[in-house]
Design a protein with these regions (language model features):
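Double-stranded beta-helix
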Residues: 27-29, 122-156
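Bacterial N-terminal signal peptides
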Residues: 5-16
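Short beta-strand His + acidic residue motifs that chelate non-heme Fe in jelly-roll/DSBH
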Residues: 74-76, 94-95, 117, 122-128
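Glycine- and acidic-residue-biased ligand/ion/polar-headgroup-sensing regions
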Residues: 68-71, 78-100
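A short, N-terminal "cap"/entry segment at the start of jelly-roll beta-barrel domains
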Residues: 19-61, 149-156
Length: 156
């Protein structure tokens, strides 16, 4: 029995010490979920955290976008460039075209779904009854142009 207790204590101590390892910051940098710096846009019902690059400037960018639960949706809009999206958590609801009807014209995309928003194509998106966290990769600047009825889309 004493030997068994010793083995259990040794295993617990070994497991605890595994978390004390320090990584070389020249090789690996990480941010724990509780330390992600979200910028909340209450009016839009979402929050964003920049992971890499600067989405307001030309070049590659990576952002996390969190659509907040409560039936928050963007209005129909388009972006100048393609965007590549992975649903990390929750269910993200996506619609295409100028007819804004989140209740009847959106597709639920669960965590693990991969989506491409093609540049200069009208879509809208958001969350219904749960938060949806997305990882978005694109080529900046990441502007969003609202679609207005009768508007002619720019050519690709």
């Amino acid at each position: 029995m004493t030997r068994l207790c010793g083995i259990i204590i040794a295993a617990v101590l070994a497991a605890g010490s595994a978390h004390a390892v320090e990584l070389d910051p020249k090789a690996v940098v990480y941010t724990l979920p509780e330390n992600i710096k979200w910028v909340v846009n209450e009016r839009a019902g979402n929050a964003q955290a920049v992971i890499a690059g600067d989405p307001t400037k030309p070049g590659l960018y990576v952002v996390l976008t969190k659509w907040l639960a409560g039936n928050h949706f963007s209005r129909p809009h388009f972006h100048p460039n393609d965007r590549f999206i992975t649903v990390i958590k929750g269910t993200w609801w996506v619609g295409s075209g100028a007819n804004f009807d989140p209740a009847n014209s959106t597709v639920p995309l669960p965590a693990g779904s991969i989506v491409t928003h093609y540049g200069k194509q009208v879509h809208y998106d958001g969350a219904k009854d749960e938060d949806a966290v997305l990882l978005i990769v694109g080529d900046g600047p990441a502007t969003s142009t609202p679609f207005v009825a009768g508007m002619e889309l720019p050519k690709k």
